[in-house]
């Protein structure tokens, strides 16, 4: 009886080892991609998700908190990034040139994408899970569907400065649930670095800049026992320490779930 139990245990253990070893090996993430823009192309793997010609998520959102990423200025040219690209939300809004030369459907011509979401699949040191639209944009003319059928491809990328049309300014969305004691804001359409590492708030008549805490994605928040009084000015710091000040951008009669456009943008 004991030998039978031992045999059974050995079989189960062998099955467990076999199950663990199945599938492609996990690849550790590479070093974080910073705002040091260079000409060198780096290797990555590319996949796509969502509808074949869509913007990625079914709700046109994603882990950065952006909304309507199918519309201008993103226009569906979006991607998830793995850890060294998404950087726990601090990579949200950053821009990359991406291209592929294989399979045959690839054009080898770079297109620009925005980081709007995250992925955690350990298939490469750098992994872009692009929208169906962005993935197809790397293809030769008329071969986008053929390229999407490839599924997983080797691709090249490099960080670039974000450039928005002249009428696009840094925009703030006051999140649902915000009130005088809790203020949460989504920051989007930041040119240059694209990503934000610090947000501060100054009340009308005050000289104090109060730091906000990163909530998730591109959303920042502040909790305060003393009610905040508008209008508010917001100061945004990008990864390369460029500071942008939007004076009185949030009016004194501000509302939750509302969009406020500034007059500022990175040159």
Swiss-Prot record:
Q: Name one GO cellular component term.
A: extracellular region
Q: Which residues are glycosylated?
A: 32, 213
- Keyword Chaperone listed: no
Q: What is its main location?
A: secreted
Q: Which Gene3D superfamilies match?
A: Expansin, cellulose-binding-like domain, RlpA-like domain
Q: Which InterPro entries match?
A: Expan_Lol_pI, Expansin/allergen_DPBB_dom, Expansin_CBD, Expansin_CBD_sf, LolPI, RlpA-like_DPBB, RlpA-like_sf
Q: Which keywords appear in this protein's UniProt record, sorted alphabetically?
A: Cell wall, Cell wall biogenesis/degradation, Disulfide bond, Glycoprotein, Membrane, Secreted, Signal
Residues forming the Expansin-like CBD domain are: 181-262
Per UniProt, subcellular location reads as: Secreted, Cell wall; Membrane
Disulfide bond annotation, renumbered to this chain: 64-92, 95-162, 100-106
Membrane-topology annotation of the record = Peripheral membrane protein
* Domain Expansin-like EG45, residue spans: 61-167
Q: Which domain of life is it from?
A: Eukaryota
Tell me the GO BP annotations in alphabetical order: plant-type cell wall loosening; sexual reproduction
Q: Which family does it belong to?
A: Belongs to the expansin family. Expansin B subfamily.
Describe the function of this protein: May cause loosening and extension of plant cell walls by disrupting non-covalent bonding between cellulose microfibrils and matrix glucans. No enzymatic activity has been found. May be required for rapid internodal elongation in deepwater rice during submergence.
Q: What is the name attached to this protein's record?
A: Expansin-B10
**Organism encoding this protein:** Oryza sativa subsp. japonica (Rice)
Q: Which gene encodes it?
A: EXPB10
């Amino acid at each position: 009886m004991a030998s039978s139990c031992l045999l059974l245990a050995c079989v189960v253990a062998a099955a467990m080892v076999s199950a663990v070893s199945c599938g492609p090996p996990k690849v550790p993430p590479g070093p974080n991609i910073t705002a040091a823009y260079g000409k060198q192309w780096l290797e990555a793997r590319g996949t796509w998700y969502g509808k074949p010609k869509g913007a990625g998520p079914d709700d046109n959102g994603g882990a950065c908190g952006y909304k309507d990423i199918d519309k201008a200025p993103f226009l569906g040219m979006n991607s998830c990034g793995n850890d060294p690209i998404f950087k726990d939300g601090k990579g949200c809004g950053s821009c990359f040139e991406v291209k592929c030369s294989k399979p045959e459907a690839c054009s080898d011509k770079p297109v620009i994408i925005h980081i709007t979401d995250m992925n955690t699949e350990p298939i490469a040191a750098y992994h872009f899970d692009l929208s169906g639209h962005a993935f197809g944009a790397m293809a030769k003319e008329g071969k986008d569907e053929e390229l999407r059928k490839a599924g997983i491809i080797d691709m090249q990328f490099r960080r670039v400065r974000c450039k928005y049309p002249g009428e696009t300014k840094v925009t703030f969305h006051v999140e649902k649930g915000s009130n005088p004691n809790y203020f949460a804001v989504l920051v989007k359409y930041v040119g240059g670095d694209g990503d934000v590492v610090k947000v501060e708030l100054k009340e009308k008549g005050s000289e104090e800049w109060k730091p906000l805490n990163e909530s998730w994605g591109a959303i920042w928040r502040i909790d305060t026992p003393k009610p905040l009084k508008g209008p508010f000015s917001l100061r945004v710091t990008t990864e390369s320490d460029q500071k942008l000040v939007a004076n009185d951008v949030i009016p004194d009669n501000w509302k939750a779930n509302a969009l406020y456009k500034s007059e500022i943008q990175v040159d």
